[in-house]
Amino acid sequence: MWGYSESEEFALVPAPPAPAADAILPTLRLPSTPEKLVAVAALPGEARNNIFAWEQCRVLRTRLQQMLRERNLRTLLVTSTIAGEGKTLVAANLAMSFSQLEDRRVLLIDGDLRRPGLGAFFGHEARAGLSDCLSNGHKLADVLVHLHAHLDYLPTAAAFEHSVELLNRGRMRELIADCAAGYDLVVVDSAPLSPIADTQVLVRLVDAALLVVRAGAAPYPLVRQAAELLQPKLIGAVLNAVERGASQVYSNRYYYGPRPEDAK
């Protein structure tokens, strides 16, 4: 099984098997910006491509590293249009990849208060976490999990029903600011944009956002809406569960726009 091990090289957890290349989501131009939504990486969905997948994760890190440095961005939100597109795996592996850089301190936050998933990824069952910092007065230092020398993890202990109200409190803004001051990079795994509003609150508190899109998963109108909701913080997309041959093409020139049949 793919996952994190302190004694081994970090490994990317693959997404479910990919559909055919022609089933990749359509292209989409955003009305709010003349720029295309550029795919900063394309991750394969087949387990046999795990070496290639990890290389693509490093490609993602390299491209993001340049963007973050040039724009002085320290907090990055990772989300998706709907559940099941692989945003938690991308967030976790991205944080691990950045933490491999020399003298780079990284914090990974489980910001999906309704359906926290990072605990299962790391095999960690938290008794307290983000929601306790926001509602019960817990100190950040008391709930942080130290994964290795350069990577810390802020868990969410349990699903929280009234998450929007909790995230809207000023304490969340303060917590993000405190984390940005103490780490070189803060990666926030957030809830999917549809059908809840949590991420619309969180995206206002971070410097940048990354949209994970699983090939053939979310309907075109929802992906378009998700991209628009993340503006102006959206800096790119990660294509997940793409066939290896297709990913070599789409990682360089993929963008969103209507299918030819949509124009009929």
Language-model segments: residues:
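Pre-Walker A (Motif I) flank of P-loop NTPase domains
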Residues: N72-L76
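Hydrophobic positions on the alpha1 helix immediately C-terminal to the Walker A/P-loop
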Residues: V90, L94
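Conserved beta-strand segments of the P-loop GTPase G domain that flank and frequently precede/overlap
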Residues: L77-T79, P155-T156, V188-D189, L211-R214, ...
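P-loop/Walker-type NTP enzyme "switch/lid" segment
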Residues: L30-T62, Q66-R69, T81-E85, R104-D184, ...
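Long, basic/Gly/Ser/Thr-rich N-terminal segments
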Residues: M1-L37
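Hydrophobic micro-sites
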Residues: W2-P14, R224-K264
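Conserved Switch II/interswitch segment of TRAFAC-class P-loop GTPases
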Residues: L193-P195, V206-V223
